[in-house]
Curated annotation (Swiss-Prot):
This is Probable inactive serine/threonine-protein kinase scy2. Residues 633-642, 664-678, 744-763, 841-858, 867-876 have a biased composition (Polar residues). Residues 680-698, 705-726, 775-824, 877-937, 964-1012, 1023-1053, 1060-1071 have a biased composition (Low complexity). Keywords: ATP-binding, Nucleotide-binding, Transferase. GO terms for molecular function: ATP binding; protein kinase activity.
Length: 1125
């Protein structure tokens, strides 16, 4: 009983131990993984050594698979395998497979470990051919599977691999003194770093003895049947226990003579090159030839095979260098050469092949050699295929990244390959972890920072968000305070894409202080400029509170410290960005106070000024729109409903009674003004003004081009409103848009939307003297047909009307009217006719245009917009029915042509000595005068406008004009009629021999209505020639009077216009009736000077209406001998 129990217990223990033995691996030091390859006898496992936790490949021979083999053959196989393992253990060379764990033998296994192996060359060749034949994707997710699939056997890769095999073979021949005798795809191993290693050293023998060290195993003793029965021709067989090399790769001398030479291994190399290049897809050789080996026999099969190989090599010599090599190595053994010559051949001397070979042996190179190599590699790295870069070059570079001496030349190559051929996942898993320690260094080298900043866009694209925040952001912030100015500038120039990853706290705490320090810390101007551009870049992502509290004060600090042009330009761009970010109120309070002084800086150029003004206008428009909306909404809820007020002055009613009454009395005039036109009369002081001063409505001529900027309003104590500052639209805009001051354009106003305002207009009273008798048979002062002359000239309105009676020359002037003539003035009867002005002054009324009967001077000084015109203007009448031949410097005849040119088309009669009565010309003793600018004509206070009129003789009046061409303005000028006034030195010398009136005015523009224009006797005031000048434009009628020979000239000019308040001269001429008796006043202004030629000629100098005024004589040519008086 007890014996039975003990037996059962032993059986249980024995069964347990047996089952455990089948589970536990007999190889105790390694963890086996998948099989990566299989030799004739060896299985190659991927494994990990337990003691060191290092990856390796384990070669395992399982004895149980050969239990059926005879004991003697099994012993021969085991002896052969031990020889191969021990030979590998004894040899150490980069091109020979390295053993990391020596061979061990147990009852069941023989194993040894080597460096990690991807596969044998035969396995890779089989994978490639299978992949080409298959239509199914056999890709693997593992790195090893990817490399196997990606192995394409391109020629550059083939050259590098063959060279490594030759290098190992040379080591065997010269150092180990061995012949390999078994070179084939089975004996070549590809490691995981894609290096080609030489193995299969079981058939090696001494070069001297040519015998294998294994006893009873000589290749010469092998018989042919062993290849046939054992299947040694390349395909495995059940009789795989026979130890034979591959027949296809044996040299011909062994097959025919059973001997090996020192260069016999070169034949095997040639045959290997043929298989990997020409016969890669198994199209060069007959695929059924190997199956005929038993039938043909070894010799016949081998001869047929070698003949096909040589023929295909010869046929492909023009296509590849590999075919040329095959023709040499597979030919006559006497022409094959030796191993050393082949290694030094041109087949391996191209730059790309040598580069790959250098990288394969990089561990044996010195640092100085590596520095030179990697510097040159950057220039040629992109010549390699993407596969070569990823699989052969990049891993070597990453393995050397820990070398601080060469890191700065390694990193550019890594970045170059990563940017072009590395996937995002591979970069995050392989590349970035390898270089992260370098990037996160506390004291990185400037070269490393420069490389990272240069490749920052690529890094942002391939890194994850977490990697960007942990690695890249600290690098950029540190580079802003970088070790050198070059790094700082490079950071500011290239790191802008990373700005979108800055959060609000980082911007306010880290970025803005750094940028401000760069702007005010004494750095070069190019760094300061880039720093300001960063402010512009960050504005859209900064909160308004940070802008107001931090950014704007820093910008003011920057502007106070530097105002160079490039800095100003960058600041303008920043303020422009701020104008799009902030609201109108913040812009008005914070941005405009900085921009307006910036626009006046002397360092900015024209384009910069335009940019500044554009920003200012945009800000003003934004602020205006917001403010208008705010006030409109406020008014909508707070203002009562507007009612009509009896005292409302939005309507102007002016009545004009055109009768023939010769009395001048205040008369109401009916006018209609647009909505936006408002006038507030202002009382001015005039010593010679009547008690009730008149007012004149003066619209501005139309403009053909948009003004460059809005008019600037001038502040004055007496001005309460400005009609031209209101927003106009439609036809009303013609009031402020004008191409020329003397335009004759008349627009037709709309018949609706009319407003009227009651304005008291007072006309001057007539002096209590007897009026002369005036004929009422004169033609109308203005033609009924409107003529529009929009030239670059000052278009004078001229009516050439012939009359036998005297006529009056009536004008509106921007001053109080005063008649100091001894003879009173009688206004002629007027007719209502269309106005012919430089712009339409129709205020929406359906009535006919009204023409006032008397001269009205407006007392309302208006603000000063800058009106501009592009042409010179002529004062006076250029149209003359009489042929006036004025032989002066620029004598031009204008015969019934309305030509007012920019140049010298004037009737110049400036220095004639024949009874010439000359008005004093405008002049300026300062830099301000009449100027020709860009559509601007204004009166500015600031300086007086003296007149230099020097009488050299009683017949000569020299006119000297000083004109500036900076801005069209009359500066602080008071115009007055200094007739018979001793205070202004304006004296009419009636005692001159020929009655020449000498007008000498030093401080004011003066005109005379009393002066004797006769030649030896006073004028008979039966005919009035009234010359009215306005703003250097004369609107006159050239009427030819052939009956009345006496002339009385009355010049009504600007008077008592006090411009000290800097008010704009914008009063528009309402109805300017001009008429003068053969008075040709031609003022031609050509920038930058003005030539003013005043000509007074009598119509009755010649009965045939020919006036010949010559500078050289004092003769009047009277063809009909008519009496002047």
């Amino acid at each position: 009983m007890d014996t039975t129990k003990s037996f059962n217990f032993k059986e249980k223990v024995r069964g347990f131990l047996g089952s455990a033995a089948s589970v536990i691996s007999p190889i105790k030091d390694h963890d086996l993984k998948e099989v990566v390859g299989q030799d004739k006898f060896w299985k190659i496992y991927q494994s990990t050594k337990k003691t060191t936790n290092t990856e390796c490949s384990l070669f395992v021979f399982e004895k149980k698979l050969y239990e059926k083999v005879s004991k003697s053959n099994l012993e021969n196989v085991i002896t052969f395998l031990k020889k191969e393992a021990t030979t590998l253990q004894r040899l150490r060379h980069p091109s020979i497979l390295q053993v990391v764990s020596v061979m061990e033998e147990t009852k069941t296994h023989i194993h040894f470990a080597t460096e990690p192996i991807l596969a044998t060359l035969e396995d890779l060749l089989g994978y490639y051919r299978q992949r080409k034949k298959s239509t199914v994707d056999q890709s693997s997710q593992s790195e090893e599977g990817y490399k196997k699939k990606d192995f394409t056997f391109e020629e550059l890769e083939l050259k590098a691999g063959i060279f490594q095999i030759l290098d190992g073979l040379l080591f065997l021949n010269q150092t180990a003194k061995l012949l390999h005798r078994n070179i084939s795809p089975e004996s070549i191993f590809i490691t995981k770093d894609l290096k080609w290693k030489l193995g299969g050293l079981g058939f090696t023998c001494s070069i001297e003895t040519k015998e294998p060290p294994i006893s009873n195993l000589s290749l010469q003793d092998l018989r042919e049947y062993q290849y046939i029965s054992g299947g040694g021709g390349g395909e495995s067989s059940n009789n795989s226990n026979y130890i034979l090399p591959q027949l296809d790769y044996l040299a011909p001398e062994f097959i025919s003579q059973r001997k090996f030479e020192t260069n016999s291994d070169l034949f095997s190399i040639g045959r290997l090159i043929f298989e990997l290049s020409i016969n890669l897809e198994q199209k060069a050789l007959d695929s059924h030839l190997i199956s005929q080996l038993p039938k043909l026999g070894v010799i016949s099969y081998y001869n047929t095979m070698i003949e096909q190989v040589r023929r295909q090599s010869t046929m492909n010599t023009q296509r590849s260098d590999s075919a040329k090599v095959c023709t040499i190595l597979l030919g006559d053994p006497m022409l094959r050469g030796d191993l050393e010559n082949f290694i030094r051949s041109s087949f391996f001397q191209d730059v790309l092949t040598k580069t790959l070979l250098y990288l394969a042996n990089i561990s044996q190179k010195e640092d100085e050699s590596k520095l030179q190599f990697f510097r040159g590699l950057l220039r040629i790295v992109q010549q390699f295929s993407p596969r070569i870069q990823n699989n052969y070059i990049l891993p070597v570079l990453l393995s050397e990244i820990s070398n601080d001496r060469i890191i700065y030349v390694l990193l550019p190559n890594i970045m170059s390959i990563s940017a072009n051929h590395v996937k995002k996942e591979t970069f995050q898993s392989k590349v970035l972890p390898a270089i992260s320690n370098i990037l996160q260094s506390k004291e990185p080298k400037p070269e490393v920072l420069s490389c990272v900043l240069e490749n920052l866009p690529m890094l942002l694209q391939k890194c994850s968000l977490d990697q960007i925040k942990k690695i890249l952001l600290p690098i950029c912030l540190g580079s802003m305070c970088g070790p050198t100015n070059e790094i700082i500038f490079q950071c500011l120039s290239t790191a802008q894409p990373i700005a979108k990853f800055f959060d609000t706290d980082m911007i306010s705490v880290a970025v803005i202080p750094r940028l401000t320090n760069l702007c005010v810390g004494g750095f070069p101007v190019h760094i300061r400029t880039k720093a300001i551009q960063w402010f512009t870049l960050l504005v859209p992502s900064i909160e308004k509170k940070i802008i107001v509290d931090s950014l704007l004060p820093n910008l003011e600090k920057i502007l106070a410290g530097d105002n160079s042009p490039v800095i100003l330009q960058s600041l303008v761009e920043t303020y422009e960005a701020l104008s799009k970010k902030l609201g109108g109120e913040l812009l008005a309070k914070s941005v405009l106070p900085a921009l307006i002084p910036l626009s006046s800086d002397k360092h900015i150029d024209l384009e910069q000024f335009k940019t500044v003004m554009k920003v200012i206008r945009d800000i003003l428009n934004t602020y205006e729109q917001e403010r208008i909306n705010e006030l409109s909404n406020l008014q909508r809820y707070t203002s009562p409903t507007p009612t009509k007020d009896e005292n409302d002055t939005s309507f102007i009613t002016v009545n004009n009674n055109n009768n023939n009454n010769n009395n001048i009395s205040p008369t109401p005039i009916n006018l209609t003004l647009p909505n936006s036109f408002g006038i507030t009369p202002i009382t001015t002081t005039a010593t010679t003004q009547p008690s009730s001063s008149p007012s004149m409505l003066f619209p501005q001529p139309p403009q053909t081009s948009q003004p460059s900027s809005s008019p600037l309003s001038s502040s004055s104590s007496g001005t309460t409103s400005n009609p031209f500052n209101s927003v106009l639209s439609g036809n009303n805009k013609a009031l402020i848009d004008s191409p020329d001051f003397g335009s004759t354009y008349i627009s037709q106003p709309p018949s609706t939307q009319q407003l009227s305002s009651n304005i008291s207009l007072t006309l001057p009273k007539s002096p209590p003297t007897t009026r002369p008798t005036v004929s009422n048979s004169s033609n109308s002062l203005f033609p009924t047909t409107n003529t529009t002359n929009n030239n670059n000239n000052n278009n004078n309105i001229n009516n050439n009307n012939s009359s036998n009676n005297g006529s009056n020359y009536n004008s509106f002037n921007n001053s109080s009217f005063q008649n100091n003539s001894n003879q009173p003035v009688q206004p002629p009867p007027q007719q209502q006719q269309p106005l012919s002005f430089n712009s339409s002054f129709d205020f929406g009324s359906n009535l006919q245009p009204i023409k006032p009967t008397n001269t009205i001077a407006a007392q309302t000084p208006l603000p000063q917009p800058k009106l501009s015109y592009n042409s010179s203007f002529d004062i006076g009448n250029s149209n003359n029915n009489n042929n006036n031949n004025n032989n002066n410097n620029n004598n031009n005849n204008n015969n019934n042509n309305n030509n007012n040119n920019n140049n010298n088309n004037n009737n110049n009669n400036n220095n004639n000595n024949n009874n010439l009565n000359s008005f004093s010309n405008f002049g300026n003793n300062s830099s301000n005068g009449m100027n020709n600018s860009n559509n601007n004509f204004a009166l500015n206070s600031g300086s007086t406008l003296p007149i230099k009129s020097t009488s050299t003789s009683k017949y000569d009046i020299n006119l000297e004009d000083h004109v500036n061409s900076s801005s069209n303005s009359f500066s602080n000028n008071s115009f007055s009629n200094n007739n018979n006034s001793s205070s202004n030195n304006n004296t009419n010398n009636n005692n001159n021999n020929n009655g020449v009136g000498n007008f000498n005015s030093s401080n004011s523009f003066s005109s005379s209505s009393q002066s004797n224009y006769g030649f030896d006797q006073p004028l008979n005031p039966t005919t009035n020639s009234n010359h009215n000048s306005y703003g250097n434009n004369n609107y006159g009628n050239n009427s030819n009077n052939n009956n009345n020979n006496n002339t009385n000239s009355m010049n009504s000019s600007f008077k008592n216009m006090d411009l000290n308040q800097n008010n704009s001269y914008n009063n528009t001429l309402n109805d300017f009736n001009s008429f003068h008796n053969n008075v040709n006043s031609s003022f031609n202004m050509n920038p930058p000077s003005i030539t003013k030629n005043v000509n007074f000629n009598s119509n009755n100098y010649n009965n045939n209406n020919n006036n010949n005024n010559n500078n050289n004589n004092n003769n009047y040519n009277n063809n009909n001998n008519s009496n002047f008086w």
